[in-house]
Amino acid sequence: MSRGGSAGGGQSSLGYLFGGNEAPKPAAKPAPAAAPAPAPAPAPAAAVAAPAEKPSPAKADATKQIPAGIQGSRSNNNYHRADGQNTGNFLTDRPSTKVHAAPGGGSSLGYLFGGN
């Protein structure tokens, strides 16, 4: 058997994809279209009333348009800021681990390194 050659066997079942050796079936002739039904007569103009215009609802206060949970004074800042009773060191009351001195400056670790 050569490379890319057929090993024989039955017909491909992929004829529907690649166009089998069958001749296409002729399309059935559509039945002649029946004459369209006559359109109903339009209703008299007096029976059709123009819809009454509804007054537009009053504009709501702009401060009421802010979604719940967003303070109006900070509406231009999308980042969450924790402010409330559960902020700070309320759990452990430990001092912060934040660096309070500039690099090379004063250090609170003098007891380790023999500070002045």
From Swiss-Prot:
| Annotated segments matching region Disordered | 1-116
Residue ranges with Pro residues bias: 27-43
Q: Where is the composition biased (Low complexity)?
A: 44-60
Q: Which GO terms describe its biological process?
A: cortical microtubule organization
**Which InterPro entries does this entry report, sorted A to Z?**
SPR1/2/3/4/5
GO CC annotations? cortical microtubule, transverse to long axis
For this UniProt record, the keywords arranged alphabetically read as follows:
Microtubule
Tell me the domain of life.
Eukaryota
Biased-composition ranges, Gly residues, are: 1-12, 103-116
UniProt keyword Cytoplasm, yes or no: no
Polar residues composition bias: which ranges?
72-90
Family, according to the entry, reads as follows: Belongs to the SPIRAL1 family.
Physiological role: Acts in maintaining the cortical microtubules organization essential for anisotropic cell growth.
PANTHER family named among the record's database cross-references: PROTEIN SPIRAL1-LIKE 1 (PTHR33403:SF48), SPR1 (PTHR33403)
What protein does this entry describe?
Answer: Protein SPIRAL1-like 1
Q: Which organism is it from?
A: Oryza sativa subsp. japonica
